Amino acid sequence: MDPAQNQPNTEPPAAPAVEEAQGVNNSEAEAPAPAALSSVSPANPPITAVPEATAPTTSQESTIPGAGYKLISTIEGHTKSISAVKFSPCGKFLGTSSADKTVKIWNMSDLSCERTLTGHKLGVNDFAWSADSKSIVTASDDKTLKIYEVPTVKMAKTLKGHTNYVFCCNFNPQSSLVVSGSFDESVRIWDVRTGMCVKTLPAHSDPVSAVSFNRDGSLITSGSYDGLVRIWDTANGQCVKTLVDDENPPVAFVKFSPNGKYILSSNLDNTLKLWDFGKGKTLKQYQGHENNKYCIFANFSVTGGKWIISGSEDCKIYVWNLQTKEVVQSLEGHTQAVIASDCHPMQNMIASGALEPDNTIRIWRSDS
């Protein structure tokens, strides 16, 4: 499913607000639709490694004193909407996925494309790196996940079991398990070694938009268009907590904070919420961006200042002060909705990706 049509068929309502954290897609579908990046392709195309040069460019960004991010490069290479951008845990690579059915791996030293992972029959909605940066798992509209060995560009396993678009995925910190969420409304847990599904959680009553492990892998959080954020015990598959406000707009994204104590959720009512999930309460709410159509990634940035980062449907990337909730910067340069973003694990750097016809990845850096 192409991110450019990843939107619900209901109009989400507005939500409420209130302390400390550390730190897409397009197809004709029955479901309301966060999802994927479909387009028809030959069955099982070969996996290829395609080196590509990229041309850095510059652009404008509007700055409110605080974060100091500036555009340093624009990367081109994908032919359709960007669905996800993620730095490798080692910080040496940037992965990007797209409706064009591929994942590309860019070397951060010169922004050259080192590898292109192919094999999916339809668009790739999401992907995740293993902890050692040597494997990638992908989630696709073709209802499968695939695990690739990055150094050899080898497709190691295909994970089958979901009955609708696979929209989101993540490795646990030990890289022994993969969690996935789907338009079939389920969350599945997979054994990486065998490629078998070890648990199927009847998680939600609408498509699952995001899944994430906590820092030790003992818990999973999932978000859905049913408006719920749920926390699951990884070992037994039991739901240990459901987070919901008085208003429950569709949940577009969820992620544990780096210290594992909080959950950041993105909601289709133009808000981000920081939850103390132990107490089941919203601590903070971040506003100012536009998000009522697409599943947009949000991030904690803890390498410099403590920021919350998110793309926006107004073609910008927004940076909030985590504690004060103020917008400290908005980054301009993309020409379409920015649904993908990530923060570098060691440097004050952001990667962002936009819908078609923009199709670009942009790299932003702060020297503050």
Curated annotation (Swiss-Prot):
Positions of the region Disordered?
A: 1-64
One GO molecular-function entry? histone binding
Q: Where is the composition biased (Low complexity)?
A: 16-42
From the UniProt record, give one GO term of the biological process aspect.
Answer: determination of adult lifespan
Q: Where are the WD repeats?
A: 77-116, 119-158, 161-200, 203-242, 246-285, 288-330, 333-368
**Entry-linked Pfam families:** Beta-prop_WDR5
- Keyword Chaperone among UniProt keywords: no
The record's section on PROSITE patterns has: WD_REPEATS_1, WD_REPEATS_2, WD_REPEATS_REGION
Q: What UniProt keywords apply to this chain's record, in alphabetical order?
A: Repeat, WD repeat
A single GO cellular-component term on record: MLL3/4 complex
How is this protein named in the record? WD repeat-containing protein wdr-5.1
* Gene name for this UniProt entry: wdr-5.1
